[in-house]
From Swiss-Prot:
One of its GO terms (cellular component) is plasma membrane. It is a single-pass membrane protein. Its main location: membrane. F(1)F(0) ATP synthase produces ATP from ADP in the presence of a proton or sodium gradient. F-type ATPases consist of two structural domains, F(1) containing the extramembraneous catalytic core and F(0) containing the membrane proton channel, linked together by a central stalk and a peripheral stalk. During catalysis, ATP synthesis in the catalytic domain of F(1) is coupled via a rotary mechanism of the central stalk subunits to proton translocation. It comes from the Bacteria. F-type ATPases have 2 components, F(1) - the catalytic core - and F(0) - the membrane proton channel. F(1) has five subunits: alpha(3), beta(3), gamma(1), delta(1), epsilon(1). F(0) has three main subunits: a(1), b(2) and c(10-14). The alpha and beta chains form an alternating ring which encloses part of the gamma chain. F(1) is attached to F(0) by a central stalk formed by the gamma and epsilon chains, while a peripheral stalk is formed by the delta and b chains. InterPro entries: ATP_synth_b/b'su_bac/chlpt (IPR002146), ATP_synthase_B_chain (IPR050059). Belongs to the ATPase B chain family. The chain crosses the membrane at residues 35-55. One of its GO terms (molecular function) is proton-transporting ATP synthase activity, rotational mechanism. The lineage of its organism: Bacteria, Pseudomonadati, Pseudomonadota, Alphaproteobacteria, Rhodobacterales. It comes from Jannaschia sp. (strain CCS1). It is found in: Cell inner membrane. This is ATP synthase subunit b 1.
Length: 190
């Protein structure tokens, strides 16, 4: 600061010595010349700015701001890459879920077909069992009816035999009647 004051006094002394009748202009050093005074004030202002390191501070601030912007850009790039990674991961998971749902649908259809075939086979077995049971019942009813016919035929034969015996028929007539009764029973059974 001492040097600046000495420089200012040195530059201003010829202007003070010249007085008011000195020529005007920027290159005419006179304190009465406003252009010269403004130039000196501006130079003094610049000197003060440089003395206190304002350009370095401004440069540092601008560099810090540029570094901040650069770090924000790097962070934005990193976030973008992370977002792309997450997007790819979600797309992959979506494909996996879609494939899994397709597999589940395929398995469900296969299980439904298997269950339908199993139900059909169970129904066929049930029908076969019921038919067999019905046939057994029919055979049992036929056997029962056959026994009833035999019993009736035997009763008729016994009654006929009783009449023959009671009527006093001959032995040949009795044999003939017995043979006829046996043939009648045979016809009724078949």
């Amino acid at each position: 600061m001492r040097y600046l004051t000495a420089l200012f006094v040195l530059v201003a002394s010829p202007a003070l010595a010249a007085g008011d009748d000195a020529p005007k202009g920027l290159f005419n050093p006179s304190l009465g010349n406003t252009d010269f005074v403004v130039l000196l004030g501006f130079l003094l202002f610049l000197a003060i700015l440089f003395y206190f390191g304002v350009p370095k501070m401004l440069g540092g601030m601008l560099d810090a701001r540029a570094e901040g912007i650069r770090s924000e850009l790097d962070e934005a790039r990193a976030l973008r890459e992370e977002a792309q990674t997450l997007l790819a991961s979600y797309e992959r998971k979506a494909r996996e879920v879609e494939e899994q749902s397709a597999r589940i649908v395929t398995e469900a259809r296969a299980n439904a077909e298997t269950a339908a075939e199993q139900a059909k086979a169970d129904i066929e077995r049930s029908i076969t069992r019921r038919l067999a049971a019905a046939e057994d019942q029919i055979a049992s009813a036929e056997a029962k009816a056959s026994r009833a016919v035999r019993d009736t035929a035997a009763s008729v034969a016994v009654a006929a035999a009783a009449e023959v015996i009671a009527g006093g028929t001959s032995a040949t007539d009795q044999n003939k009647m017995i043979d006829e009764a046996i043939e009648e029973v045979g016809r009724q059974l078949h």
